[in-house]
A protein has these predicted regions:
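Short, solvent-exposed positions on alpha-helices
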Residues: 9-12, 61
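Short, charged surface segments at domain edges that flank catalytic/cofactor-binding sites
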Residues: 1-10, 89-93
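Short Cys/His-centered divalent metal-binding micro-motifs
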Residues: 16-19, 47-75
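Short flanking/linker segments adjacent to small metal-binding domains or redox-active Cys/His motifs
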Residues: 80-117
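Histidine-centered nuclease catalytic patch
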Residues: 12-48
Length: 117
């Protein structure tokens, strides 16, 4: 969903255009706070944005550049809220299925809107 949501935006880190034409896609859903160090933020949309693979994987996430891009996109207050969020979240299997279904629904809607443009 995040990759589709941000498809028309530049990379959150470097500002270069995203290119979906490459095999396997040329961009990922990158997380500002990694899912390894902050698994509780995995499904928080402010924490996830389209990011070129070069920035996400081989640039070690480019945290400083990501933060600067994030401030431009969502504002300093929301970035600081992400940075301060230490609230653990434990999802049940049913909650995870509901999240999956919600994101599938939203992705279908995005694709339909893009097809109608």
């Amino acid at each position: 969903f995040i990759r589709a949501r941000d498809a028309d935006k530049p990379c959150i880190c470097c500002g270069l255009p995203l290119s979906a034409g490459d095999v396997g896609g040329a961009y990922d859903c990158g997380h500002y706070r990694s899912t390894g160090s902050a698994p509780h933020l995995r499904f928080v949309e402010d924490n996830a944005h389209a990011q070129r693979k070069q920035c996400n994987r081989w640039g070690a996430g480019r945290a400083v550049d990501y933060r600067l891009g994030l401030i431009q996109r969502i504002g300093l207050e929301r970035v600081e809220a992400l940075e301060a969020d230490q609230e653990p979240r434990k999802y049940t299997a049913d909650e995870l299925k509901a999240l999956r279904d919600e994101y599938r629904r939203r992705l279908r809607k995005l694709r339909q809107e893009a097809a109608n443009v």
